[in-house]
Amino acid sequence: MGRRRVEIKRIENKSSRQVTFCKRRNGLMEKARQLSILCGSSVALFIVSSTGKLYNSSSGDSMAKIISRFKIQQADDPETLDLEDKTQDYLSHKELLEIVQRKIEEAKGDNVSIESLISMEEQLKSALSVIRARKTELLMELVKNLQDKEKLLKEKNKVLASEVGKLKKILETGDERAVMSPENSSGHSPPETLPLLK
């Protein structure tokens, strides 16, 4: 009995997804190394995880040399530029989304190859990873700002509490002096002593 074919779809369980990613990433890198040795080819491999972490590996030639060859070929054939190369000069997410939307509209045609769709899917995943990383960065900055404000408010409250304590002591000391003063004991001057009768 042959092995059951595993359906290729997104793994919902986060832990299982991470384990599968690590295993398949290592397997892919090993396959790339074997391809380089068996066929004498140069292989460069870039992998971006769902958390935005980049992994890369090269076999045959160095990564820099392979990338240099890639850039030369891209310059000779501009039509092969992928979405990332086309959008590297765009600064806003709005412009990026507009380009993605246009690509999706183009993909509705019948002349789009499966390779183009797969490439576009990978570009969208990369864009989402960048956006998620930026979102996390902004949230961390917001949390830090809130923590700084909380710390500042606590320090101000501490200073105010100290000032209130000092005022209370001053008021209490003033009341004690007023009570001990002879003129304030009954509200009148002390009575004069009558002379003794001779």
UniProtKB/Swiss-Prot annotation:
SUPFAM superfamilies according to UniProt: SRF-like
Region annotation Disordered: where it falls in the sequence: 175-198
Q: Which UniProt keywords apply?
A: Developmental protein, DNA-binding, Flowering, Nucleus, Transcription, Transcription regulation
Main subcellular localisation: nucleus
Q: Which PROSITE patterns match?
A: K_BOX (PS51297), MADS_BOX_2 (PS50066)
Q: Which residues form the K-box domain?
A: 80-173
**GO biological process, any:** flower development
| Compartments (UniProt record) | Nucleus
Report if keyword Transcription is assigned. Answer: yes
Please state, per the UniProt record, what induces or represses the expression of this protein.
Up-regulated by vernalization. Repressed by VIL2, AGL6, CLF, EMF2 and FIE via epigenetic chromatin H3K27me3 and H3K9me2 regulation during the vegetative development.
Cellular component GO terms, alphabetical? nucleus
Return the Gene3D superfamilies for the record: Transcription factor, MADS-box
Molecular-function GO term, any one:
protein dimerization activity
Q: Give residue ranges for domain MADS-box.
A: 1-61
InterPro entries given for it? MADS-box/MEF2_TF, TF_Kbox, TF_MADSbox, TF_MADSbox_sf
What this chain does, per the record? Answer: Transcription factor involved in the negative regulation of flowering time in short days, probably through the photoperiodic and vernalization pathways. Prevents premature flowering, particularly in the cv. Landsberg erecta background. In non-inductive photoperiods (e.g. short days), required for flowering through VIL2-mediated maintenance of the epigenetically repressed state of MAF5 via H3K9me2 and plant homeodomain / polycomb repressive complex 2 (PHD-PRC2)-dependent H3K27me3.
According to UniProt, the name of this protein is Protein MADS AFFECTING FLOWERING 5
- Taxonomic source organism: Arabidopsis thaliana
Q: What is the lineage of its organism?
A: Eukaryota, Viridiplantae, Streptophyta, Embryophyta, Tracheophyta
The gene designation is: MAF5
